[in-house]
Amino acid sequence: MRSHTIKKPFERSGVGLHSGITTQVKVLPAKPGEGRYFVRVDLPQQPIIPAKLAYVNQTPLSTELKSPQGSVRTVEHLLAALSGSGINDVRIEIDGPEVPLLDGSAQQWIEAIASAGMIELTDEETTPTVMISSPISVQEGDAFVLALPARELRFTYGIDFAYSVIGNQWYSWNPASESFAEAIAPARTFGFADQIESLKQAGLIKGGSLENALVCDHQGWVNPPLRFSNEPVRHKLLDLVGDLSLLETIPLAHFLAYKASHKLHIELAKAIHGTVKVSEHHFKGFPENALTS
Protein backbone atom coordinates (compact mmCIF):
# COMPACT_ATOMS: atom_id res chain seq x y z
CA MET A 1 0.00 0.00 0.00
CA ARG A 2 1.20 3.47 -0.84
CA SER A 3 1.14 6.76 1.02
CA HIS A 4 -1.33 9.47 -0.03
CA THR A 5 -2.17 12.97 1.13
CA ILE A 6 -4.36 15.82 -0.14
CA LYS A 7 -3.13 18.19 -2.85
CA LYS A 8 -4.27 21.39 -1.17
CA PRO A 9 -5.70 22.44 2.21
CA PHE A 10 -9.41 22.77 2.88
CA GLU A 11 -11.49 24.13 5.77
CA ARG A 12 -14.85 23.36 7.29
CA SER A 13 -16.59 24.75 10.36
CA GLY A 14 -19.64 23.79 12.34
CA VAL A 15 -21.06 22.83 15.71
CA GLY A 16 -19.92 19.82 17.71
CA LEU A 17 -22.60 17.23 18.44
CA HIS A 18 -21.94 16.85 22.15
CA SER A 19 -20.18 20.08 23.17
CA GLY A 20 -22.39 22.42 21.16
CA ILE A 21 -19.22 24.45 20.48
CA THR A 22 -18.57 25.81 16.99
CA THR A 23 -15.11 24.90 15.74
CA GLN A 24 -13.12 25.34 12.56
CA VAL A 25 -11.12 22.50 11.04
CA LYS A 26 -8.31 23.02 8.55
CA VAL A 27 -6.98 19.90 6.84
CA LEU A 28 -3.51 20.19 5.32
CA PRO A 29 -1.13 17.95 3.35
CA ALA A 30 1.43 15.98 5.35
CA LYS A 31 4.73 14.30 4.53
CA PRO A 32 5.12 10.54 4.01
CA GLY A 33 5.06 8.70 7.30
CA GLU A 34 3.57 11.53 9.34
CA GLY A 35 0.22 9.79 9.49
CA ARG A 36 -3.11 11.38 10.37
CA TYR A 37 -2.96 13.67 13.37
CA PHE A 38 -4.90 16.49 14.99
CA VAL A 39 -3.41 19.76 16.23
CA ARG A 40 -5.31 21.80 18.85
CA VAL A 41 -4.32 25.26 17.55
CA ASP A 42 -6.42 26.96 20.25
CA LEU A 43 -4.32 25.56 23.10
CA PRO A 44 -0.90 26.62 24.40
CA GLN A 45 1.91 24.81 22.58
CA GLN A 46 -0.62 23.57 20.01
CA PRO A 47 -0.48 19.91 21.12
CA ILE A 48 -0.48 17.12 18.56
CA ILE A 49 -3.01 14.30 19.00
CA PRO A 50 -2.26 11.32 16.71
CA ALA A 51 -5.21 9.46 15.22
CA LYS A 52 -4.02 6.19 16.71
CA LEU A 53 -5.61 3.54 18.88
CA ALA A 54 -3.24 4.25 21.78
CA TYR A 55 -4.73 7.76 22.11
CA VAL A 56 -8.38 6.72 22.50
CA ASN A 57 -9.69 8.18 25.75
CA GLN A 58 -13.43 7.51 25.98
CA THR A 59 -16.19 6.31 23.71
CA PRO A 60 -19.70 7.27 24.98
CA LEU A 61 -21.73 8.04 21.83
CA SER A 62 -18.54 9.15 20.03
CA THR A 63 -14.81 8.48 19.86
CA GLU A 64 -12.37 10.79 21.63
CA LEU A 65 -8.59 11.00 21.27
CA LYS A 66 -6.40 12.44 23.99
CA SER A 67 -2.74 13.37 24.46
CA PRO A 68 -1.24 14.76 27.70
CA GLN A 69 -1.89 18.35 26.58
CA GLY A 70 -5.24 18.14 24.81
CA SER A 71 -8.08 16.10 23.36
CA VAL A 72 -10.44 16.05 20.41
CA ARG A 73 -13.82 14.35 20.28
CA THR A 74 -16.18 12.87 17.66
CA VAL A 75 -13.37 12.12 15.23
CA GLU A 76 -14.99 9.09 13.60
CA HIS A 77 -16.78 10.70 10.62
CA LEU A 78 -13.75 12.67 9.43
CA LEU A 79 -11.43 9.70 9.93
CA ALA A 80 -13.82 7.43 8.04
CA ALA A 81 -13.93 9.92 5.15
CA LEU A 82 -10.14 10.09 5.02
CA SER A 83 -9.90 6.31 5.10
CA GLY A 84 -12.61 5.89 2.49
CA SER A 85 -10.74 8.34 0.26
CA GLY A 86 -7.40 6.57 0.70
CA ILE A 87 -5.76 9.45 2.59
CA ASN A 88 -3.26 8.26 5.19
CA ASP A 89 -0.96 11.27 5.76
CA VAL A 90 -2.72 14.49 6.79
CA ARG A 91 -2.49 17.28 9.36
CA ILE A 92 -5.83 18.31 10.92
CA GLU A 93 -5.82 21.66 12.70
CA ILE A 94 -8.82 22.33 14.96
CA ASP A 95 -9.58 25.31 17.20
CA GLY A 96 -11.78 23.52 19.71
CA PRO A 97 -12.51 20.24 21.50
CA GLU A 98 -14.81 18.55 18.99
CA VAL A 99 -14.89 17.92 15.25
CA PRO A 100 -17.94 19.59 13.64
CA LEU A 101 -20.85 17.26 13.00
CA LEU A 102 -21.76 19.10 9.76
CA ASP A 103 -24.88 17.34 8.39
CA GLY A 104 -24.39 14.27 10.58
CA SER A 105 -22.73 12.17 7.89
CA ALA A 106 -19.31 12.00 6.21
CA GLN A 107 -20.58 13.37 2.91
CA GLN A 108 -19.33 16.95 3.31
CA TRP A 109 -15.91 15.65 4.35
CA ILE A 110 -15.81 13.39 1.30
CA GLU A 111 -16.76 16.30 -0.97
CA ALA A 112 -14.08 18.52 0.58
CA ILE A 113 -11.43 15.82 0.16
CA ALA A 114 -12.44 15.25 -3.46
CA SER A 115 -12.25 18.99 -4.15
CA ALA A 116 -8.80 19.20 -2.55
CA GLY A 117 -7.52 16.29 -4.61
CA MET A 118 -5.16 13.48 -3.68
CA ILE A 119 -1.49 12.92 -4.45
CA GLU A 120 0.67 9.83 -4.04
CA LEU A 121 3.63 10.52 -1.78
CA THR A 122 5.51 7.31 -2.53
CA ASP A 123 5.55 5.03 -5.56
CA GLU A 124 6.55 1.95 -3.61
CA GLU A 125 4.76 -0.34 -1.20
CA THR A 126 5.16 0.98 2.35
CA THR A 127 3.69 -1.98 4.22
CA PRO A 128 2.33 -5.45 3.43
CA THR A 129 -1.36 -6.17 3.80
CA VAL A 130 -2.21 -7.41 7.29
CA MET A 131 -4.50 -10.42 7.32
CA ILE A 132 -6.65 -12.01 10.01
CA SER A 133 -5.76 -15.71 10.32
CA SER A 134 -8.37 -16.71 12.93
CA PRO A 135 -11.59 -15.14 14.28
CA ILE A 136 -11.23 -12.29 16.78
CA SER A 137 -14.31 -11.12 18.67
CA VAL A 138 -15.59 -8.98 21.52
CA GLN A 139 -19.05 -9.16 23.07
CA GLU A 140 -21.24 -7.36 25.58
CA GLY A 141 -24.60 -8.99 26.23
CA ASP A 142 -26.13 -9.75 22.84
CA ALA A 143 -23.98 -7.10 21.12
CA PHE A 144 -20.77 -8.13 19.40
CA VAL A 145 -18.11 -7.23 16.86
CA LEU A 146 -15.82 -9.74 15.21
CA ALA A 147 -13.18 -10.01 12.52
CA LEU A 148 -13.21 -13.15 10.38
CA PRO A 149 -10.52 -14.40 7.97
CA ALA A 150 -11.46 -13.38 4.42
CA ARG A 151 -10.00 -13.05 0.95
CA GLU A 152 -11.51 -9.62 0.47
CA LEU A 153 -12.37 -6.73 2.75
CA ARG A 154 -16.01 -6.64 3.85
CA PHE A 155 -18.03 -4.92 6.57
CA THR A 156 -21.40 -6.27 7.73
CA TYR A 157 -23.53 -4.54 10.36
CA GLY A 158 -26.82 -5.33 12.06
CA ILE A 159 -28.97 -3.19 14.35
CA ASP A 160 -32.24 -3.81 16.20
CA PHE A 161 -34.26 -1.01 17.80
CA ALA A 162 -37.74 -0.95 19.34
CA TYR A 163 -38.82 1.79 16.94
CA SER A 164 -40.85 0.47 14.02
CA VAL A 165 -39.26 2.81 11.46
CA ILE A 166 -35.87 1.24 12.21
CA GLY A 167 -36.49 -2.23 13.63
CA ASN A 168 -34.00 -4.86 12.52
CA GLN A 169 -31.66 -3.78 9.72
CA TRP A 170 -28.62 -5.41 8.14
CA TYR A 171 -26.19 -4.07 5.58
CA SER A 172 -23.06 -5.60 4.06
CA TRP A 173 -20.52 -3.50 2.22
CA ASN A 174 -17.61 -4.59 0.02
CA PRO A 175 -15.36 -1.59 -0.84
CA ALA A 176 -14.33 -3.26 -4.09
CA SER A 177 -17.89 -3.24 -5.44
CA GLU A 178 -19.41 -0.09 -3.88
CA SER A 179 -17.61 3.19 -3.26
CA PHE A 180 -17.50 4.62 0.25
CA ALA A 181 -18.53 8.00 -1.16
CA GLU A 182 -21.80 6.65 -2.57
CA ALA A 183 -22.75 3.78 -0.27
CA ILE A 184 -21.60 4.88 3.19
CA ALA A 185 -20.61 8.55 3.45
CA PRO A 186 -24.13 10.07 2.99
CA ALA A 187 -25.64 8.10 5.91
CA ARG A 188 -26.44 10.44 8.83
CA THR A 189 -26.31 9.91 12.57
CA PHE A 190 -29.66 9.21 14.19
CA GLY A 191 -31.36 9.47 17.55
CA PHE A 192 -34.63 9.07 19.40
CA ALA A 193 -36.97 11.88 20.42
CA ASP A 194 -37.78 10.34 23.80
CA GLN A 195 -34.08 10.22 24.77
CA ILE A 196 -33.09 13.77 23.85
CA GLU A 197 -33.81 15.39 27.21
CA SER A 198 -32.01 12.75 29.29
CA LEU A 199 -28.95 12.89 27.03
CA LYS A 200 -28.80 16.67 27.30
CA GLN A 201 -29.07 16.44 31.09
CA ALA A 202 -26.08 14.07 30.93
CA GLY A 203 -24.08 16.75 29.11
CA LEU A 204 -24.40 15.13 25.68
CA ILE A 205 -25.84 16.15 22.26
CA LYS A 206 -25.77 19.87 23.12
CA GLY A 207 -25.23 20.59 19.43
CA GLY A 208 -27.71 18.07 18.05
CA SER A 209 -30.56 19.33 15.87
CA LEU A 210 -32.92 18.27 13.11
CA GLU A 211 -30.39 19.73 10.67
CA ASN A 212 -27.55 17.41 11.66
CA ALA A 213 -29.26 14.20 12.79
CA LEU A 214 -32.17 11.96 11.90
CA VAL A 215 -34.68 11.77 14.75
CA CYS A 216 -37.50 9.29 15.18
CA ASP A 217 -40.20 8.45 17.69
CA HIS A 218 -42.58 5.51 17.89
CA GLN A 219 -44.81 7.08 15.24
CA GLY A 220 -42.11 7.55 12.60
CA TRP A 221 -39.35 9.87 11.45
CA VAL A 222 -39.57 13.44 12.73
CA ASN A 223 -37.48 14.86 9.88
CA PRO A 224 -37.74 12.74 6.72
CA PRO A 225 -36.84 11.93 3.99
CA LEU A 226 -34.07 9.37 4.44
CA ARG A 227 -31.19 9.11 2.00
CA PHE A 228 -31.39 5.30 2.10
CA SER A 229 -34.17 3.04 3.34
CA ASN A 230 -31.58 1.55 5.72
CA GLU A 231 -29.71 4.78 6.48
CA PRO A 232 -29.34 4.04 10.24
CA VAL A 233 -27.42 0.79 9.77
CA ARG A 234 -25.26 2.35 7.06
CA HIS A 235 -24.32 5.08 9.50
CA LYS A 236 -23.32 2.51 12.10
CA LEU A 237 -21.05 0.96 9.49
CA LEU A 238 -19.56 4.40 8.80
CA ASP A 239 -18.72 4.71 12.51
CA LEU A 240 -17.11 1.26 12.47
CA VAL A 241 -14.83 2.21 9.56
CA GLY A 242 -13.76 5.40 11.33
CA ASP A 243 -13.05 3.60 14.59
CA LEU A 244 -11.13 0.73 12.97
CA SER A 245 -8.97 3.19 11.05
CA LEU A 246 -7.33 4.02 14.40
CA LEU A 247 -5.51 0.69 13.99
CA GLU A 248 -3.38 2.51 11.37
CA THR A 249 -3.61 -0.61 9.19
CA ILE A 250 -7.06 -2.09 8.64
CA PRO A 251 -6.54 -5.85 8.22
CA LEU A 252 -7.96 -7.81 5.34
CA ALA A 253 -10.97 -9.41 7.00
CA HIS A 254 -14.73 -9.64 7.15
CA PHE A 255 -15.81 -7.36 10.00
CA LEU A 256 -19.20 -8.31 11.41
CA ALA A 257 -21.02 -6.23 14.03
CA TYR A 258 -24.41 -6.46 15.71
CA LYS A 259 -25.97 -3.88 18.04
CA ALA A 260 -22.48 -2.59 18.72
CA SER A 261 -21.15 0.75 19.95
CA HIS A 262 -18.02 2.88 19.70
CA LYS A 263 -16.88 1.13 22.87
CA LEU A 264 -17.12 -2.31 21.26
CA HIS A 265 -15.57 -1.07 18.00
CA ILE A 266 -12.54 0.13 19.95
CA GLU A 267 -12.39 -3.06 22.01
CA LEU A 268 -12.22 -5.10 18.80
CA ALA A 269 -9.50 -2.82 17.43
CA LYS A 270 -7.51 -3.35 20.63
CA ALA A 271 -8.02 -7.12 20.43
CA ILE A 272 -6.79 -7.09 16.84
CA HIS A 273 -3.81 -4.93 17.79
CA GLY A 274 -2.90 -7.39 20.52
CA THR A 275 -3.20 -10.40 18.23
CA VAL A 276 -2.06 -9.25 14.80
CA LYS A 277 1.23 -7.54 14.09
CA VAL A 278 0.08 -4.07 13.02
CA SER A 279 2.36 -1.38 11.61
CA GLU A 280 3.69 1.03 14.22
CA HIS A 281 3.74 3.75 11.59
CA HIS A 282 0.86 5.65 10.02
CA PHE A 283 -2.45 4.39 8.71
CA LYS A 284 -1.95 2.70 5.35
CA GLY A 285 -5.56 2.72 4.25
CA PHE A 286 -7.66 -0.13 2.98
CA PRO A 287 -5.90 -3.00 1.18
CA GLU A 288 -4.62 -1.96 -2.24
CA ASN A 289 -7.41 -1.62 -4.83
CA ALA A 290 -10.07 -2.23 -2.18
CA LEU A 291 -11.79 1.08 -2.89
CA THR A 292 -13.45 2.33 -6.01
CA SER A 293 -13.55 6.00 -6.88
Swiss-Prot record:
The active site is at H262 (proton donor). One of its GO terms (biological process) is lipid A biosynthetic process. It holds the Pfam family LpxC. One of its GO terms (molecular function) is metal ion binding. It comes from the Bacteria. InterPro entries: Ribosomal_Su5_D2-typ_SF, UDP-acyl_GlcNac_deAcase, UDP-acyl_GlcNac_deAcase_C, UDP-acyl_N-AcGlcN_deAcase_N. Keywords: Hydrolase, Lipid A biosynthesis, Lipid biosynthesis, Lipid metabolism, Metal-binding, Zinc. Its cofactor is Zn(2+). It catalyses: a UDP-3-O-[(3R)-3-hydroxyacyl]-N-acetyl-alpha-D-glucosamine + H2O = a UDP-3-O-[(3R)-3-hydroxyacyl]-alpha-D-glucosamine + acetate. Pathway: Glycolipid biosynthesis; lipid IV(A) biosynthesis; lipid IV(A) from (3R)-3-hydroxytetradecanoyl-[acyl-carrier-protein] and UDP-N-acetyl-alpha-D-glucosamine: step 2/6. Zn(2+) binds at H77, H235, D239. GO terms for cellular component: membrane. Catalyzes the hydrolysis of UDP-3-O-myristoyl-N-acetylglucosamine to form UDP-3-O-myristoylglucosamine and acetate, the committed step in lipid A biosynthesis. PANTHER family: UDP-3-O-ACYL-N-ACETYLGLUCOSAMINE DEACETYLASE 1, MITOCHONDRIAL-RELATED (PTHR33694:SF1). Belongs to the LpxC family. NCBIfam families: lpxC. This is UDP-3-O-acyl-N-acetylglucosamine deacetylase. The gene is lpxC.
